[in-house]
């Protein structure tokens, strides 16, 4: 043990047996995985895709929660996605251990939500400011439009856009070298909107940094409150975030334990256009999990060609290994790019039975690309530049969790989309809670329900104890809808919400009539065996004209599928400075280059994309004329 407060917690073989039985699904941990679960030192775990990293972490958390001796000190689990939280809810959500993990005194959430909740929000409020909205895209646009036309025109000529309207690096600084009147105007707009309660995500981290630097006691309090820290997907933590973590947990091995779980080959961060090579993970002496249980040795061998780590991944034989599946590269001419999607759809139908496609429906078949946001028309030499050049109906922002909607019903509809996509009811409740928060704050005409990492919990917090049970029941009733919302159904749901609003001493007024009104939904439907079903955003239905068999293919960025498992994946050729496959094709060959050069981020993105599929992996390549 490294710290005295955790000495009495020892993970035994009996604990391992208990957690295997608790998790079910024929979970069994070999000696390598058992040693990781038992390890209570500050150490990192380099885990290759499909090695069961998240399951190992969930098992460890379950044992710790069962044996946790403190009422006011907790376990802290940070990540960049909610995959760990989702797995806890799926595996342990129905028992006491799961409920313990997901509630006080423990914290399981994103790095952003942690620093918002425990550092930035209290710090900003101590300055006399309220927080009404944290959203980079919306807030930057709001600030941009408050600048005069002349100022915006000048900035555009300097190749600046809305992103200039946010603090960068530290509080009070923006990404503009020149001082003068223009910079002063931007800073004035930022300051005024912050006084109104509007902040970007990155600004919240900057305020957290400011607080940690100015008040030494914050780090001591955090480590006292959370003596053990787990970082899931640690490789996606950028240099600025590592700096924050090391300021907050500045006595690692003395006052707290830190364990990072991740794969250095998948360090793709969030911005393709920013080079941020962090050497913080894995630390020296890391434990290695190199056996993938997602796919067999054929896919492992293909993915290893674009891996940057010295260690190599091993595959595991699965139910698809004997089928001699034809992993494929589609070679196409530029004018035939959309046809690649149909060829992929046909290959899926030729490879898998309808029973197999149905059995793995939750994992699904996916088309992914490195570039997916369209900023301008694609020049001929750059075609295909992004996913949108293969399928013009692709909408990169369609299901963004940070989206601010004009109408309440849109939050409910996106909640249904999330549930249909993932099967996770908690994601639907998250969307509903966002909508209810906006409804209540509009009605109260103030920031009555503050922003937090868990909006549902924030809604509960402002209610008296004797109203919370009724509120939970009403949210449960509202989240019971899994299909399209009809106009009559919406009116019925509004009846429930009117009763709910009474708990907050609110009655429906003209101020919120516009927000809660019914609006029509886009009509995207598909005929399937006489049944008409709703097509989710960014889903393409391929139909075999001869057999009338169909397959649902989902489109998305490489970043959006990180941490997920697919039945089949097609990785598209896209353009960022050069065509992706053109730049990395040599690494896929028998004798790869000795030097990676400037291809680190490109190779990591390709590695993430090529390690999603459990059965069928496809690439495409534009044909050179």
Describe the residue ranges of each PLM region:
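The feature marks helicase ATPase cores and/or their adjacent C-terminal helical subdomains
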Residues: 1-625
């Amino acid at each position: 043990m490294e710290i005295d407060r955790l000495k009495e917690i020892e993970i035994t073989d009996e604990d391992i047996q208990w957690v295997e039985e608790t998790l079910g699904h024929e979970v069994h941990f070999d000696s390598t995985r058992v040693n990781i679960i038992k390890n209570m030192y500050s150490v990192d775990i380099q885990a290759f895709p499909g090695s069961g990293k998240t399951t190992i972490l969930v098992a460890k958390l379950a044992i710790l929660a069962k044996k946790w001796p403190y009422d006011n000190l907790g376990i802290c689990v940070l990540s960049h996605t909610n995959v760990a939280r989702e797995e806890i809810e799926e595996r342990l959500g129905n028992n006491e251990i799961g409920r313990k993990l997901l509630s006080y005194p423990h914290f399981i959430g994103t790095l952003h939500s942690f620093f918002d909740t425990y550092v930035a929000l209290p710090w900003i409020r101590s300055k006399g400011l309220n927080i009404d909205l944290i959203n980079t895209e919306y807030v930057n646009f709001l600030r941009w439009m408050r600048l005069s036309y002349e100022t915006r025109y000048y900035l555009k000529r300097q190749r600046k856009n809305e992103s200039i309207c946010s603090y960068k690096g530290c509080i009070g600084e923006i990404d503009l070298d020149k001082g003068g009147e223009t910079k002063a105007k931007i800073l004035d707009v930022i300051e005024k909107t912050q006084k109104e309660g509007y902040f970007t995500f990155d600004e919240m981290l900057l305020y957290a940094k400011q607080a940690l630097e100015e008040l030494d006691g914050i780090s001591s309090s955090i480590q006292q409150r959370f003596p053990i820290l787990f970082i899931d997907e640690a490789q996606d933590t950028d240099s600025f975030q590592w700096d924050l973590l090391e300021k907050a947990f500045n006595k690692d091995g003395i006052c707290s334990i830190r364990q990072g779980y991740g794969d250095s080959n998948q360090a793709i961060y969030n911005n393709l256009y920013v080079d941020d090579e962090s050497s913080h993970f894995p630390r020296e002496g890391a434990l290695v999990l190199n056996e993938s249980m997602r796919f067999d040795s054929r896919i492992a061998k293909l993915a290893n060609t674009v891996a940057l780590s010295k260690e190599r991944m091993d595959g595991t034989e699965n139910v698809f290994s004997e089928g001699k599946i034809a992993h494929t590269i589609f070679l196409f001419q530029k004018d035939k790019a959309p046809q690649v999607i149909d060829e992929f759809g046909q290959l899926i139908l030729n490879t898998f039975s309808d029973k197999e496609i149905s059995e793995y429906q939750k994992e699904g078949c996916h088309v992914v690309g490195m570039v997916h946001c369209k900023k301008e028309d694609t020049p001929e030499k750059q075609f295909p530049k992004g996913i949108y050049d293969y399928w013009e109906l692709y909408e990169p922002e369609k299901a963004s969790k940070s989206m601010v909607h004009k109408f309440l019903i849109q939050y409910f509809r996106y909640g249904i989309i999330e549930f249909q996509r993932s099967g996770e009811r908690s994601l639907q409740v998250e969307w509903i809670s966002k909508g209810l928060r906006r409804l209540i704050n509009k009605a109260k005409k103030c920031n009555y329900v503050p922003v937090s990492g868990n909006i549902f919990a924030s809604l509960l917090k402002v209610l008296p104890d004797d109203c919370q049970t009724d509120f939970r029941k009403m949210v449960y009733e509202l989240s019971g809808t899994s299909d399209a919302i009809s106009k009559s159904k919406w009116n019925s749901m509004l009846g429930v919400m009117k009763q709910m609003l009474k708990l907050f001493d609110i009655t429906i007024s003209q101020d919120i009539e516009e927000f809660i009104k019914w609006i029509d939904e886009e009509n995207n439907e598909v005929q399937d065996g006489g049944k008409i079903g709703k097509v989710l955003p960014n889903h393409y239905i391929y139909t075999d004209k001869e057999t009338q068999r169909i397959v649902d293919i989902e489109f998305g960025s490489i970043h959006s599928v990180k941490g997920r498992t697919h039945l089949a994946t097609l990785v598209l050729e896209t353009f960022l400075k050069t065509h992706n496959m053109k730049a990395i094709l040599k690494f896929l060959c028998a004798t790869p280059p000795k030097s990676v050069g400037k291809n680190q981020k490109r190779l990591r993105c390709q590695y993430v994309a090529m390690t999603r599929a459990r059965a069928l992996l496809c690439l495409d390549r534009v044909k050179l004329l």
